[in-house]
Amino acid sequence: MNLQHHFLIAMPALQDPIFRRSVVYICEYNDEGAMGIIINKPLENLQVEGILEKLKIVPEPRNPEIRLDKPVMLGGPLAEDRGFILHTPPSDFSSSIRISDNTVVTTSRDVLETLGTDRQPGNVLVALGYSSWEKGQLEQEILDNAWLTAPADQNILFRTPIADRWREAAKLIGIDIVTMPGVAGHA
């Protein structure tokens, strides 16, 4: 099982305040564990333009058709002061990792400097913090019915309204998660 470029979809019974009703995009999955970014938990009162202002980044030349009022996501409970930018190619920034053919994660300032300009990647999701699991931890949580898994979908990752991402991610595997009971069993 390789969960890289997959969604983790929180089961209804998962009540942890950070992960309740969350969708986590798995950026890295290997023998040492997993790392992902929550894609449906916007930080209150923080938008991309606020991050750029705080870092004193002025988009030049500014393309007024590109919106910078998109919310910044809480990527997870770890390193909440560190930025992670999920985007579509190109991946020629100084600190980019290609996750799939059409998804890249970048942690360097140079990608932020393209936001709001014609050099910006086509699709962008900005998050602060990340989520991580040690070796075997995520697999156990899946066995314990904390998470469903589904192959990642670009539309859900970048274009589906944030409030709909949990429900839409579950639909990828044929589940209406809103009507699902809080506890599931094993067959």
UniProtKB/Swiss-Prot annotation:
It holds the Pfam family DUF179. Coiled coil: none annotated. InterPro entries: AlgH-like. GO terms for cellular component: cytosol. PANTHER family: UNCHARACTERIZED PROTEIN YQGE (PTHR30327), UPF0301 PROTEIN YQGE (PTHR30327:SF1). Belongs to the UPF0301 (AlgH) family. This is UPF0301 protein KPK_0728. It comes from Klebsiella pneumoniae (strain 342).
